[in-house]
Amino acid sequence: MTICLASTDREIQEIRDLQEVNLKDNIPLENRLSDGFLTAKYELDFLREMNDLTPAIIAKEKGVLVGYALATNRSMLTQHPLLNDLGAQINKIPFGGKLIGDYDYLVVGQLCVAKEVRGRGLAKDLYTHFRANYERHYAFAVTDVDRDNLASLTTHLKVGFQVVSVLQYGGSNWHVVVWDWRKSQK
């Protein structure tokens, strides 16, 4: 397994392909609870623009992309409806004695691991590289997890994220989770 930054157009296309398979609408209802799902659909041009600013962390096995963690800086939040809703909401949440919006933070735009490699610790490995690549520039990572996506919430909590708020927007209920990189443990 190789974990690195996404750098080619082919890798961006592979991210988009893996995303498509794992979107909520493409996962049978009976599998969503155990398998998890993705909520936001990103088009190729948006993924390219996001990757130009803050490259995604990707995992490849035998040359095939099997997982990714999208990094999204604040300038991209207004470019997508769900990210815009997230940004508008999270900036007002108290955290560490200030509002989240008062910090330099990085949004996890999406985390996805291919079904065939789940259960091998890849989400943790992706996030370890994510932190190593971005913690010098940001106080923490923040994202939201659909309240119906218990598989994703469990994964995020195991990595070190903590729930800081529960919000409703975009027609769903969300856990807002923060991984505070100012703490010394890695």
Regions from the PLM with identified roles:
Residues L44-I58, S75-P81, V107:
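A short helix-loop-beta-strand connector motif used in the catalytic cores of GNAT acetyltransferases and
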Residues L53-A69, D85-G87:
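Conserved beta-hairpin
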Residues K24-L44:
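Conserved GNAT-fold acetyl-CoA-binding loop/helix
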Residues M1-L29:
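A short beta-loop-alpha structural element at the N-terminal edge
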Residues D144, L157-V176:
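Conserved catalytic-core motifs of GNAT/GCN5-like acyltransferases
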Residues L70-Q110:
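Conserved acyl-donor/pantetheine-binding loop and adjacent beta-alpha core of acyl/acetyltransferases
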Residues Q110-V113, G119-A132, T154, K158:
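Conserved acetyl-CoA-binding loop-helix of GNAT-fold acetyltransferases
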Residues L106, Y134-D146:
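Conserved GNAT acetyl-CoA-binding A-motif
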